[in-house]
């Protein structure tokens, strides 16, 4: 099958199109013919050898999330799964390919009427956004700051916070991303490349700051957002687009009673992890969640997809199409 290999850590050019053996399902596995591959920012870090979760052994076919059709199953798996439209995590690798073997227990059916590409777009980002919104306990009337608001997770967080009746401040960089945040319905839009962006947030909130921060950037942006968090507010660390987590060790957190929350608290058990995926698919099928698929690339152009994400040129979700 066609696949994309990572033979050595490096820039986007380290992703090399090639061939891989056709996968054969082992016991408890299913083979999926891939129609869409979810590409995440973390995968660009993995490719560069800077994974926050530990680097894989090379060579490897990257990719941790796919959507497609089950074409075969191994021993112990219901034959009725063959032909089903599904999304699935892959166990950390193997997704950048035409076919991939996955654990049958990780396969989640795609609701009737929902496009597989849309389903793939919410596999990771929808699961994460719903989990983070629930974790933060976003309530009607609260001010919510979403960093990286035009990204895959951020654009969904904006939608979910608005659905809860919150007043949303969307922070992003550049006119295209700010325009998208406005289209999504954000009440206030700020460009955090402006030196006065925090002043704009304080002005919008009457000087009180925000009740909830979804910190998808980290670094200096996250540190500034932490200072904007109101007394008793919630600071949710949801990503590190800057390459580093926000330093939350300062005394101001305790002094102002800010609650620190993070990704590790979202789905602590496999059952909860799966439940969030099902909820994300249901929300997408009903139209309550509308992922922004900003760009798609052919499988063999995975390097271009990574380059777009790293250049901050990507809007919403990026998919590979085999």
Where are these regions (language model features)?
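NAD(P)H dinucleotide-binding glycine-rich loop of Rossmann-like/cofactor-binding domains
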Residues: 45, 79, 87-150
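NAD(P)H cofactor-binding loop motif with strongest signal on the N-terminal glycine-rich segment
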Residues: 148-149, 217, 240
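Short amphipathic alpha-helix with an adjacent loop that forms part of the alpha/beta core around
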Residues: 196-207
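Mid-domain Rossmann-like dinucleotide-binding core that forms the NAD(H)/NADP(H) cofactor-binding site
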Residues: 81, 120-194
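Glycine-rich phosphate-binding loop and adjacent beta-alpha segment
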Residues: 220-288, 322
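N-terminal glycine-rich beta->alpha transition that marks the start or flank
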Residues: 11-14, 20-67
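C-terminal hydrophobic helical "lid"/dimerization subdomain
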Residues: 1, 271-322
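A glycine-/small-residue-rich N-terminal strand-loop-strand element
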Residues: 51, 67-92
